[in-house]
């Protein structure tokens, strides 16, 4: 039953993306839901996706995060949300710019939202709340999928803390094991 729902959702997403007249990626090959956040816009015409920013939600559930990203007054979103059990919710088509990085810079290039994919992982970001095995697997699956289309070396899988300006403005994702993620995402 869940697979059938996923196929229906994938079909609807594909139709919406084609309607935007942009080259569309096939749906992420994971069981996932899609809820289009209003908090996104077009990437600059010359933008090349070459970075993934990993976040911690500081919220307690996928549902709470989805509701936040669906609220236009919040003016925040990410491309994907990953729950504690590894469930994935896509909130913004990869071809669009999600609003996850804020004022940011990577290797001297500002406006990280322009050229990145944002992945939010449900976690309190207190350094004590562990990231689950299922979350690592799901995030790695998303990255493997993205790497089929975009050049995303391990050095371009970064934390929100690493790109936020001014330095120290963000701390997420505290306690996340990037070496483990890179090994799983090969």
What are these regions (language model features)?
Residues 9, 13, 17-31, 122-186:
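Basic/polar, cationic surfaces and motifs that engage anionic cell-wall
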Residues 110-121:
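Short coil-to-beta-strand
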Residues 53, 79, 118-120, 158:
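Soluble periplasmic/extracytoplasmic beta-strand elements of cell-envelope proteins
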Residues 2-111:
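N-terminal catalytic cores of peptidoglycan-degrading enzymes
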Residues 63-66, 113, 133, 146:
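Short secondary-structure boundary micro-motifs
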């Amino acid at each position: 039953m869940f697979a059938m729902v996923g196929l229906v959702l994938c079909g609807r997403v594909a139709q919406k993306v084609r309607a935007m007249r942009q080259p569309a990626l096939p749906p992420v090959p994971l069981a996932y839901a899609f809820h289009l956040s209003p908090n996104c816009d077009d990437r600059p015409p010359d933008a090349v996706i070459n970075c993934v920013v990993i976040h911690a939600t500081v919220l307690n559930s996928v549902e709470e995060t989805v509701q936040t990203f669906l609220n236009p007054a919040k003016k925040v979103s990410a491309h994907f949300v990953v729950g504690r059990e590894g469930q994935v919710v896509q909130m913004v088509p990869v071809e669009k710019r999600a609003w996850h990085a804020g004022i940011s810079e990577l290797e001297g290039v500002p406006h990280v939202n322009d050229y990145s994919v944002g992945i939010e992982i449900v976690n309190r970001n207190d350094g004590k709340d562990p990231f689950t095995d299922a979350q690592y697997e799901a995030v790695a699956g998303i990255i493997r999928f993205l790497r089929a289309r975009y050049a995303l070396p391990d050095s371009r899988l970064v934390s929100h803390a690493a790109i936020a300006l001014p330095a120290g403005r963000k701390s997420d994702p505290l306690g996340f094991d990037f070496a483990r993620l890179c090994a799983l995402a090969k």
